[in-house]
Amino acid sequence: MAGQPDRRINLAVARVIPVVLFGIIIYSCYVITKPLCIDYLIDPLPKYNRPSRVGAGAAILVVFYILLLFVIITYVRLLYTVVYNPDLLPRSQAADQQSTPAKRSKSRSRRKGHGHGHRKSKSDEVSDKPVSDVERALDYNAGPMVLPWDTAGLEYFYKKDVFVCQPDGRPIYCSKCCHYKPDRTHHCREVDRCVRKMDHFCPWVGGVVSETSFKFFIQFVFYTALFCMTVLIVCAIYTAELRQDVSLISGSRNMLIISRLVMLTLIGLSDSLQLAAFNLTTIENLNRRSAVWTLAIRVPNHMISRIQPGTRWAPTFRTITYPLPPVPPPLSGMPTQPATGEGDNPYSPPPVPSTDPSAEQHIFAILQTLPGENPFALGSPLKNLQQVLGHSIIDWLLPIKRSPCADHSSAESEFVMGPVVSRLKKEAGLESKDAAAGSITTKHKNSSYNSSPSAPADKRSKRKQKRGKHHHHHHHHRHSSTTGTT
């Protein structure tokens, strides 16, 4: 019961904090421009008794407002993406059908409680609220539509070559949204939706930081850090000059307090740079040293006959074949077909797809990484950063294009896979024919290269053959001349 108010509070704070940040920026602009640059450096007030320093004041203003411009641009781009393109996955109809009766029952219980002074006992609250493990699709007391009845929605996954799966080979399932989740997708409690490559819910930027906004979040952190460091250095320099003037200590202290508060905030936010260098999200980083990823990796066509039952070659891995066969009929007591005239039953299973034996089959090997391995790490921090920030300097500095990792059009996998997946394929013998042919060609070239020391022997054999031909030709000439003389 406490989750709903907390969610509303977090959303309300996420809408208020951006306004507060803009207020802090406006106040810092006033402090740097009027009291420091104009009244102290460019046109000093009589009480300072100091000469005019127009160059220093102008330089500070130029650097300050250039950095401020980048801060505002990146922040506006970030806010727009977080609000209008957070990359949320749509909820399934089954989830909406489950949530509607639950909301009605909660509203009725509230009205009864307010009207008659009845308060729910603790046991009632526990029985009404399902005990769930959202990430593992375990949702007890969640109703008959917690798991799918057919293979609807699985085609998106088994058309890829690699995807993250459960131990049984099916994709990760969200029991709250009632659908399968693409790789690195997590359910956000604040928005009650699944988010692609969710990093964290950040009230400072107004919502969820995900794959569509993580790049702009890093750029905003970077320019804000430069901006705050500039303000901090300027304030430190001129505070040292004004240290003996008691009337100016309070103003300089205010500037230092603001700068230090913002810097302390940025220290926590700058961790995202480290996460991007390791190609991790904040959620994945929680157990990155012990996490074990289960992957479904496509078995190449030339190996399918070898893993069939009755063959001599015994695979060292479990497999799963898509499309999945029809599920067994539901348990007794669970409605399966709507009654005549009652319309659609929200608890009836969808129609079971037809299983044509001639239909194309997709066989996947179920493999697991070692603890602490990251299948999405590309082998170097630069390659990992390029997946978030882009492949050019302009992409790194300007918040224009989206991250390359937000493009999921590849037929290989949802995200670019690293050396860990290549090693798993090699250990399981799942390399494709092209890769095997490439390795054979490489070996052939290497063997030719390694056999180069025997080249002199080849030359000697060629010389022998040449001498043999010359000797045969000379003998034939002598024989013909002798015959002519005779």
Curated annotation (Swiss-Prot):
<keyword id="KW-0808">Transferase</keyword>
<dbReference type="GO" id="GO:0019706">
    <property type="term" value="F:protein-cysteine S-palmitoyltransferase activity"/>
</dbReference>
<feature type="compositionally biased region" description="Low complexity">
    <location>
        <begin position="447"/>
        <end position="456"/>
    </location>
</feature>
<feature type="region of interest" description="Disordered">
    <location>
        <begin position="94"/>
        <end position="130"/>
    </location>
</feature>
<dbReference type="InterPro" id="IPR039859">
    <property type="entry name" value="PFA4/ZDH16/20/ERF2-like"/>
</dbReference>
<feature type="compositionally biased region" description="Basic residues">
    <location>
        <begin position="103"/>
        <end position="121"/>
    </location>
</feature>
<feature type="transmembrane region" description="Helical">
    <location>
        <begin position="12"/>
        <end position="32"/>
    </location>
</feature>
<feature type="transmembrane region" description="Helical">
    <location>
        <begin position="54"/>
        <end position="74"/>
    </location>
</feature>
<comment type="similarity">
    <text>Belongs to the DHHC palmitoyltransferase family. PFA5 subfamily.</text>
</comment>
<keyword id="KW-0449">Lipoprotein</keyword>
<keyword id="KW-1133">Transmembrane helix</keyword>
<keyword id="KW-0012">Acyltransferase</keyword>
<feature type="region of interest" description="Disordered">
    <location>
        <begin position="433"/>
        <end position="486"/>
    </location>
</feature>
<feature type="transmembrane region" description="Helical">
    <location>
        <begin position="261"/>
        <end position="281"/>
    </location>
</feature>
<keyword id="KW-0812">Transmembrane</keyword>
<protein>
    <recommendedName>
        <fullName>Palmitoyltransferase pfa5</fullName>
        <ecNumber>2.3.1.225</ecNumber>
    </recommendedName>
</protein>
<dbReference type="GO" id="GO:0006612">
    <property type="term" value="P:protein targeting to membrane"/>
</dbReference>
<dbReference type="Pfam" id="PF01529">
    <property type="entry name" value="DHHC"/>
</dbReference>
<dbReference type="GO" id="GO:0016020">
    <property type="term" value="C:membrane"/>
</dbReference>
<feature type="compositionally biased region" description="Basic residues">
    <location>
        <begin position="460"/>
        <end position="480"/>
    </location>
</feature>
<keyword id="KW-0472">Membrane</keyword>
<keyword id="KW-0564">Palmitate</keyword>
<feature type="domain" description="DHHC">
    <location>
        <begin position="172"/>
        <end position="222"/>
    </location>
</feature>
<dbReference type="GO" id="GO:0005783">
    <property type="term" value="C:endoplasmic reticulum"/>
</dbReference>
<feature type="region of interest" description="Disordered">
    <location>
        <begin position="326"/>
        <end position="357"/>
    </location>
</feature>
<dbReference type="InterPro" id="IPR001594">
    <property type="entry name" value="Palmitoyltrfase_DHHC"/>
</dbReference>
<feature type="transmembrane region" description="Helical">
    <location>
        <begin position="217"/>
        <end position="237"/>
    </location>
</feature>
<dbReference type="GO" id="GO:0005794">
    <property type="term" value="C:Golgi apparatus"/>
</dbReference>
